[in-house]
Amino acid sequence: MSGEIKWLRQLNLFFVAMSFFTRIPVPSWVVIDSDKLNKASRYFGLVGLLIGLICALVFWLAQLILPASIAILLAMVAGVLVTGAFHEDGLADTADGFGGGWTVEDKLRIMKDSRLGSYGALSLGLVLLLKWQLLVELALYSPMAAVSALVAGHTLSRVVASSLIFSEQYVRDDDTSKSKPIAQDQQLNDLFILIASGIFVLLWLNGVAAFVLFITLWLVRILLGGFFRKQIGGYTGDTLGAAQQISEVCCYLVILAVGLS
Protein backbone atom coordinates (compact mmCIF):
# COMPACT_ATOMS: atom_id res chain seq x y z
CA MET A 1 0.00 0.00 0.00
CA SER A 2 2.81 2.41 0.89
CA GLY A 3 4.49 1.63 -2.45
CA GLU A 4 1.29 2.53 -4.29
CA ILE A 5 1.02 5.80 -2.35
CA LYS A 6 4.61 6.71 -3.23
CA TRP A 7 3.94 5.92 -6.90
CA LEU A 8 0.83 8.12 -6.89
CA ARG A 9 2.78 10.89 -5.18
CA GLN A 10 5.40 10.81 -7.93
CA LEU A 11 2.71 10.72 -10.62
CA ASN A 12 1.14 13.77 -9.00
CA LEU A 13 4.50 15.57 -9.16
CA PHE A 14 4.86 14.70 -12.85
CA PHE A 15 1.43 16.15 -13.59
CA VAL A 16 2.34 19.27 -11.60
CA ALA A 17 5.46 19.66 -13.74
CA MET A 18 3.36 19.13 -16.86
CA SER A 19 0.87 21.79 -15.77
CA PHE A 20 3.75 24.24 -15.20
CA PHE A 21 5.36 23.76 -18.62
CA THR A 22 2.38 22.99 -20.86
CA ARG A 23 -1.27 23.71 -21.61
CA ILE A 24 -2.11 20.00 -21.46
CA PRO A 25 -4.99 19.37 -19.02
CA VAL A 26 -4.16 17.32 -15.93
CA PRO A 27 -6.52 15.00 -14.01
CA SER A 28 -8.83 16.66 -11.50
CA TRP A 29 -7.32 14.70 -8.59
CA VAL A 30 -3.89 16.29 -9.06
CA VAL A 31 -2.90 18.56 -6.16
CA ILE A 32 -1.04 21.67 -7.33
CA ASP A 33 0.55 23.97 -4.77
CA SER A 34 3.89 25.67 -4.11
CA ASP A 35 5.33 22.70 -2.24
CA LYS A 36 4.41 20.27 -5.03
CA LEU A 37 5.77 22.62 -7.68
CA ASN A 38 9.05 22.86 -5.79
CA LYS A 39 9.43 19.08 -5.75
CA ALA A 40 8.22 18.68 -9.35
CA SER A 41 11.43 20.13 -10.79
CA ARG A 42 12.83 16.58 -10.97
CA TYR A 43 10.38 15.85 -13.78
CA PHE A 44 10.94 18.93 -15.93
CA GLY A 45 13.16 16.89 -18.25
CA LEU A 46 10.47 14.22 -18.66
CA VAL A 47 7.94 16.89 -19.54
CA GLY A 48 10.39 18.07 -22.18
CA LEU A 49 10.50 14.50 -23.46
CA LEU A 50 6.70 14.49 -23.72
CA ILE A 51 6.72 17.79 -25.62
CA GLY A 52 9.43 16.49 -27.94
CA LEU A 53 7.46 13.31 -28.65
CA ILE A 54 4.36 15.34 -29.50
CA CYS A 55 6.32 17.58 -31.88
CA ALA A 56 8.05 14.56 -33.42
CA LEU A 57 4.71 12.82 -33.97
CA VAL A 58 3.24 15.89 -35.66
CA PHE A 59 6.28 16.13 -37.91
CA TRP A 60 6.26 12.43 -38.77
CA LEU A 61 2.59 12.43 -39.75
CA ALA A 62 2.86 15.70 -41.67
CA GLN A 63 5.94 14.66 -43.66
CA LEU A 64 4.01 11.70 -45.07
CA ILE A 65 1.94 14.06 -47.23
CA LEU A 66 3.70 17.45 -47.05
CA PRO A 67 7.17 18.83 -47.85
CA ALA A 68 9.72 18.60 -45.04
CA SER A 69 9.82 22.38 -44.59
CA ILE A 70 6.07 22.54 -43.93
CA ALA A 71 6.13 19.47 -41.70
CA ILE A 72 8.84 21.04 -39.53
CA LEU A 73 6.88 24.29 -39.32
CA LEU A 74 3.80 22.38 -38.17
CA ALA A 75 5.90 20.58 -35.54
CA MET A 76 7.16 23.93 -34.26
CA VAL A 77 3.60 25.28 -34.17
CA ALA A 78 2.57 22.21 -32.18
CA GLY A 79 5.33 22.92 -29.67
CA VAL A 80 4.20 26.51 -29.27
CA LEU A 81 0.57 25.47 -28.82
CA VAL A 82 1.44 22.78 -26.27
CA THR A 83 3.61 25.10 -24.17
CA GLY A 84 1.77 28.37 -24.76
CA ALA A 85 5.06 29.85 -26.01
CA PHE A 86 6.21 29.74 -22.39
CA HIS A 87 9.93 29.62 -23.13
CA GLU A 88 9.79 31.83 -26.21
CA ASP A 89 8.21 34.54 -24.06
CA GLY A 90 11.07 34.20 -21.58
CA LEU A 91 13.63 34.56 -24.36
CA ALA A 92 11.98 37.72 -25.66
CA ASP A 93 11.67 39.27 -22.19
CA THR A 94 15.30 38.44 -21.39
CA ALA A 95 16.53 39.98 -24.64
CA ASP A 96 14.50 43.13 -24.01
CA GLY A 97 15.73 43.42 -20.43
CA PHE A 98 19.39 42.74 -21.10
CA GLY A 99 19.41 44.82 -24.27
CA GLY A 100 17.47 47.81 -22.98
CA GLY A 101 18.41 48.05 -19.31
CA TRP A 102 21.53 49.61 -17.81
CA THR A 103 21.12 48.63 -14.17
CA VAL A 104 19.92 45.38 -12.62
CA GLU A 105 16.73 47.10 -11.50
CA ASP A 106 16.09 48.40 -15.02
CA LYS A 107 16.64 44.98 -16.55
CA LEU A 108 14.29 43.25 -14.11
CA ARG A 109 11.64 45.92 -14.62
CA ILE A 110 11.82 45.67 -18.42
CA MET A 111 11.73 41.87 -18.29
CA LYS A 112 8.50 42.03 -16.31
CA ASP A 113 6.89 44.32 -18.90
CA SER A 114 4.53 42.26 -21.06
CA ARG A 115 5.11 44.43 -24.12
CA LEU A 116 7.45 43.11 -26.81
CA GLY A 117 10.43 45.33 -27.61
CA SER A 118 12.81 45.42 -30.54
CA TYR A 119 15.46 43.25 -28.84
CA GLY A 120 12.86 40.65 -27.95
CA ALA A 121 11.33 40.59 -31.42
CA LEU A 122 14.73 40.27 -33.07
CA SER A 123 15.94 37.48 -30.77
CA LEU A 124 12.68 35.58 -31.10
CA GLY A 125 12.66 35.85 -34.88
CA LEU A 126 16.28 34.77 -35.22
CA VAL A 127 15.95 31.80 -32.87
CA LEU A 128 12.76 30.53 -34.51
CA LEU A 129 14.26 30.91 -37.97
CA LEU A 130 17.44 29.14 -36.91
CA LYS A 131 15.52 26.25 -35.35
CA TRP A 132 13.38 25.86 -38.46
CA GLN A 133 16.37 25.88 -40.82
CA LEU A 134 18.37 23.39 -38.75
CA LEU A 135 15.43 21.01 -38.42
CA VAL A 136 14.63 21.25 -42.14
CA GLU A 137 18.22 20.28 -42.97
CA LEU A 138 17.94 17.30 -40.63
CA ALA A 139 14.58 16.30 -42.11
CA LEU A 140 15.94 16.46 -45.66
CA TYR A 141 18.76 14.14 -44.62
CA SER A 142 16.39 11.71 -42.92
CA PRO A 143 12.95 12.05 -41.28
CA MET A 144 14.22 9.97 -38.35
CA ALA A 145 17.10 12.42 -37.86
CA ALA A 146 14.56 15.21 -37.36
CA VAL A 147 12.49 13.02 -35.03
CA SER A 148 15.54 12.25 -32.89
CA ALA A 149 16.57 15.91 -32.87
CA LEU A 150 13.13 17.10 -31.78
CA VAL A 151 12.98 14.61 -28.91
CA ALA A 152 16.55 15.27 -27.81
CA GLY A 153 16.33 19.04 -28.23
CA HIS A 154 13.15 19.51 -26.23
CA THR A 155 14.30 17.20 -23.45
CA LEU A 156 17.94 18.20 -23.03
CA SER A 157 17.26 21.93 -23.32
CA ARG A 158 14.85 21.73 -20.41
CA VAL A 159 17.32 19.71 -18.38
CA VAL A 160 19.98 22.38 -18.95
CA ALA A 161 17.63 25.27 -18.13
CA SER A 162 16.15 23.57 -15.06
CA SER A 163 19.58 22.63 -13.72
CA LEU A 164 20.34 26.33 -13.26
CA ILE A 165 17.78 26.34 -10.45
CA PHE A 166 20.10 24.17 -8.36
CA SER A 167 23.19 26.37 -8.61
CA GLU A 168 22.09 29.95 -9.23
CA GLN A 169 20.38 32.56 -7.08
CA TYR A 170 16.76 33.49 -7.78
CA VAL A 171 16.68 37.28 -7.95
CA ARG A 172 13.01 38.27 -7.89
CA ASP A 173 11.27 39.08 -4.61
CA ASP A 174 7.79 39.20 -6.14
CA ASP A 175 5.58 36.61 -4.42
CA THR A 176 3.32 36.48 -7.49
CA SER A 177 6.14 35.15 -9.66
CA LYS A 178 5.22 31.80 -11.21
CA SER A 179 8.80 30.55 -10.90
CA LYS A 180 9.45 31.48 -7.27
CA PRO A 181 8.18 28.20 -5.73
CA ILE A 182 10.66 26.11 -7.73
CA ALA A 183 13.55 28.25 -6.46
CA GLN A 184 13.09 27.27 -2.81
CA ASP A 185 15.30 24.61 -1.16
CA GLN A 186 15.96 22.28 -4.07
CA GLN A 187 17.19 18.80 -3.13
CA LEU A 188 20.15 16.96 -4.64
CA ASN A 189 18.10 13.87 -5.47
CA ASP A 190 15.81 16.08 -7.59
CA LEU A 191 18.85 17.14 -9.60
CA PHE A 192 19.94 13.52 -10.05
CA ILE A 193 16.52 12.54 -11.42
CA LEU A 194 16.54 15.57 -13.72
CA ILE A 195 19.99 14.68 -15.09
CA ALA A 196 18.98 11.02 -15.47
CA SER A 197 16.20 12.00 -17.87
CA GLY A 198 18.77 13.81 -19.98
CA ILE A 199 21.16 10.85 -19.98
CA PHE A 200 18.30 8.58 -21.03
CA VAL A 201 17.70 10.70 -24.12
CA LEU A 202 21.42 10.93 -24.93
CA LEU A 203 21.42 7.15 -25.27
CA TRP A 204 19.17 7.55 -28.32
CA LEU A 205 22.00 9.20 -30.23
CA ASN A 206 25.19 7.70 -31.58
CA GLY A 207 28.20 7.75 -29.26
CA VAL A 208 30.06 10.64 -30.86
CA ALA A 209 27.00 12.87 -31.11
CA ALA A 210 25.99 12.08 -27.52
CA PHE A 211 29.46 12.89 -26.20
CA VAL A 212 29.82 16.15 -28.15
CA LEU A 213 26.29 17.17 -27.20
CA PHE A 214 26.95 16.50 -23.51
CA ILE A 215 30.15 18.58 -23.54
CA THR A 216 28.52 21.37 -25.56
CA LEU A 217 25.50 21.66 -23.29
CA TRP A 218 27.70 21.53 -20.19
CA LEU A 219 29.70 24.48 -21.56
CA VAL A 220 26.52 26.30 -22.58
CA ARG A 221 25.18 25.88 -19.05
CA ILE A 222 28.38 27.31 -17.54
CA LEU A 223 28.38 30.26 -19.93
CA LEU A 224 24.70 31.03 -19.45
CA GLY A 225 24.97 30.80 -15.67
CA GLY A 226 27.91 33.20 -15.67
CA PHE A 227 26.21 35.54 -18.11
CA PHE A 228 23.02 35.69 -16.05
CA ARG A 229 25.01 36.34 -12.87
CA LYS A 230 26.85 39.19 -14.56
CA GLN A 231 23.66 40.73 -15.91
CA ILE A 232 21.25 40.43 -12.96
CA GLY A 233 23.05 38.48 -10.22
CA GLY A 234 21.24 35.18 -10.83
CA TYR A 235 18.22 33.90 -12.67
CA THR A 236 14.51 34.52 -13.17
CA GLY A 237 11.83 32.49 -14.89
CA ASP A 238 12.45 34.51 -18.03
CA THR A 239 16.16 33.69 -18.13
CA LEU A 240 15.35 30.01 -17.69
CA GLY A 241 13.14 30.30 -20.76
CA ALA A 242 15.97 31.96 -22.65
CA ALA A 243 18.34 29.20 -21.53
CA GLN A 244 15.93 26.57 -22.83
CA GLN A 245 15.63 28.21 -26.24
CA ILE A 246 19.39 28.71 -26.61
CA SER A 247 20.12 25.15 -25.48
CA GLU A 248 17.55 23.76 -27.92
CA VAL A 249 19.25 25.55 -30.81
CA CYS A 250 22.62 24.20 -29.66
CA CYS A 251 21.21 20.67 -29.64
CA TYR A 252 20.10 20.96 -33.26
CA LEU A 253 23.42 22.51 -34.28
CA VAL A 254 25.44 19.69 -32.73
CA ILE A 255 23.22 16.93 -34.10
CA LEU A 256 23.39 18.43 -37.59
CA ALA A 257 27.16 19.02 -37.45
CA VAL A 258 28.25 15.83 -35.71
CA GLY A 259 25.38 13.39 -35.60
CA LEU A 260 25.12 13.06 -39.37
CA SER A 261 28.84 12.83 -40.10
From Swiss-Prot:
The UniProt keywords, alphabetically, are:
Cell inner membrane, Cell membrane, Cobalamin biosynthesis, Magnesium, Membrane, Transferase, Transmembrane, Transmembrane helix
- Residue intervals passing through the bilayer: 12-32, 46-66, 67-87, 120-140, 199-219
Signal peptide positions on this chain: none
Catalytic activity entry: alpha-ribazole + adenosylcob(III)inamide-GDP = adenosylcob(III)alamin + GMP + H(+); alpha-ribazole 5'-phosphate + adenosylcob(III)inamide-GDP = adenosylcob(III)alamin 5'-phosphate + GMP + H(+)
Major enzyme class: transferase
CC cofactor: Mg(2+)
Please give the Gene Ontology molecular function terms for this protein: adenosylcobinamide-GDP ribazoletransferase activity; cobalamin 5'-phosphate synthase activity
- Write down the superkingdom of origin: Bacteria
Q: What is its main location?
A: membrane
Q: Which GO terms describe its biological process?
A: cobalamin biosynthetic process
Q: In which pathway does it act?
A: Cofactor biosynthesis; adenosylcobalamin biosynthesis; adenosylcobalamin from cob(II)yrinate a,c-diamide: step 7/7
As for membrane topology, the entry says: Multi-pass membrane protein
Protein family per UniProt: Belongs to the CobS family.
Q: What does this protein do?
A: Joins adenosylcobinamide-GDP and alpha-ribazole to generate adenosylcobalamin (Ado-cobalamin). Also synthesizes adenosylcobalamin 5'-phosphate from adenosylcobinamide-GDP and alpha-ribazole 5'-phosphate.
Give the protein name, as stated in the record. Answer: Adenosylcobinamide-GDP ribazoletransferase
Q: What is the lineage of its organism?
A: Bacteria, Pseudomonadati, Pseudomonadota, Gammaproteobacteria, Alteromonadales
What gene is it encoded by?
A: cobS
